[in-house]
Amino acid sequence: MMAFCALRKALPCRPENPFSSRCFVEILWVSLALVFLLPMPSDACDEPPKFESMRPQFLNTTYRPGDRVEYECRPGFQPMVPALPTFSVCQDDNTWSPLQEACRRKACSNLPDPLNGQVSYPNGDMLFGSKAQFTCNTGFYIIGAETVYCQVSGNVMAWSEPSPLCEKILCKPPGEIPNGKYTNSHKDVFEYNEVVTYSCLSSTGPDEFSLVGESSLFCIGKDEWSSDPPECKVVKCPYPVVPNGEIVSGFGSKFYYKAEVVFKCNAGFTLHGRDTIVCGANSTWEPEMPQCIKDSKPTDPPATPGPSHPGPPSPSDASPPKDAESLDGGIIAAIVVGVLAAIAVIAGGVYFFHHKYNKKRSK
């Protein structure tokens, strides 16, 4: 009834004649439109279920109860054993059944360990999508892919790359340096972990060469040494002088590479900086030279006056004792009382004399 009233308001029909032919036609059209727009109960299933291991062989646009969809295993998968249904049927309640995977992953072939190396399987198996990792023994390096994956190659299962090789680690000579040499310099190839040691030649000048850097190098990888070759050069730092200080350790007339000197300050001075310095590779002292700074003189505190011994006090300076102060107060009070009493006596005498005199005159 409410819908009918709404339609009456919406349609340009005369209120007094809602069932005219024109109004009836318009109501019919609106009703048909509502029928088509409102969702209708369906007797068809949705799209067939999707599986990781299977895919539909054929797809239709609609599926009614009883329709059946056949599945096949995807590449890299094969039917399970024992076999499970590889189809699904649209049921009367518009659902699909059965809903289960019916295929399993295929496996790649087992990989042998490379010579002087090993292979491992992080996923715990060699199934489709799994990976294998290769490592080489100490002193060997890998040539090829360290990680390979089990995948589909055409119609067969195969690993993504061929197995790598493990080759022995060898190093080329580390190189000559000016004013220096290294052990076993006659060799063209050095094996893994083999060491060479550098040293400096004797100088023809007044100062000896210093070896700056690592003296021993190790072959740690294919043509890779543990560090760059060192240098042989003259490193000489100037004589260290700290004003108001002195050297307590590291005395010498010349100070070469890594020479160490320790300072202390004279009495009345404080050391600012490090007390120990070292001659660096650039012929400079490291860290910076310390300084001896004069101690600041402490400010004398104000003198505290001590006990004094003055002479006998003058009468004007002497303070009266407390007893004297009390005595003076008592005397003043007595004087005041005495004066008042005398005034009272005199007043009484005057009154008595005046009264007696007036009495005699009256007689």
UniProtKB/Swiss-Prot annotation:
Question: Do you know which Pfam families this protein is assigned to?
Answer: Sushi (PF00084)
Q: Which residues form the signal peptide?
A: 1-44
This entry carries the following GO cellular component terms, namely: cell surface; extracellular space; inner acrosomal membrane; membrane; plasma membrane
Q: Residue spans with biased composition (Pro residues)?
A: 299-315
InterPro entries linked to this entry: CD46, SEZ6_CSMD_C4BPB_Regulators, Sushi/SCR/CCP_sf, Sushi_SCR_CCP_dom
Cysteines joined through disulfide linkages: C108-C150, C136-C166, C171-C219, C200-C232, C237-C279, C265-C292
Q: Which domain of life does the protein's organism represent?
A: Eukaryota
Keywords tagged on the record: Complement pathway, Cytoplasmic vesicle, Disulfide bond, Fertilization, Glycoprotein, Immunity, Innate immunity, Membrane, Repeat, Signal, Sushi, Transmembrane, Transmembrane helix
The subcellular location is:
Cytoplasmic vesicle, Secretory vesicle, Acrosome inner membrane
Record has Secreted as a keyword: no
Instruction: State the post-translational modifications.
Output: N-glycosylated.
Expression sites by tissue: Broadly expressed. Expressed on erythrocytes, leukocytes, granulocytes, platelets, vascular endothelial cells and kidney epithelial cells. Not or weakly expressed in muscle cells and skin (at protein level).
Carbohydrate attachment residues: N60, T86, S296, T299, T304, S308, S314, S316, S319
Q: Where is this region: Disordered?
A: 290-324
Report the membrane topology from the UniProt record. Answer: Single-pass type I membrane protein
Instruction: List, for all copies, the residue spans of the domain called Sushi.
Output: 45-105, 106-168, 169-234, 235-294
- Segments on the Extracellular side according to the record's topology features: 45-329
Cite the ranges annotated as topological domain Cytoplasmic. Answer: 351-363
- The membrane-spanning stretches of this chain are 330-350
- Name any one GO molecular function: endopeptidase activity
Which GO BP terms, alphabetically? complement activation, classical pathway; innate immune response; negative regulation of complement activation, alternative pathway; negative regulation of complement activation, classical pathway; proteolysis; single fertilization; T cell mediated immunity
State what this protein does.
Acts as a cofactor for complement factor I, a serine protease which protects autologous cells against complement-mediated injury by cleaving C3b and C4b deposited on host tissue. May be involved in the fusion of the spermatozoa with the oocyte during fertilization. May act as a costimulatory factor for T-cells which induces the differentiation of CD4+ into T-regulatory 1 cells. T-regulatory 1 cells suppress immune responses by secreting interleukin-10, and therefore are thought to prevent autoimmunity.
How this chain assembles, per its entry, is: Interacts with C3b. Interacts with C4b. Interacts with moesin/MSN.
Q: What is this protein called?
A: Membrane cofactor protein
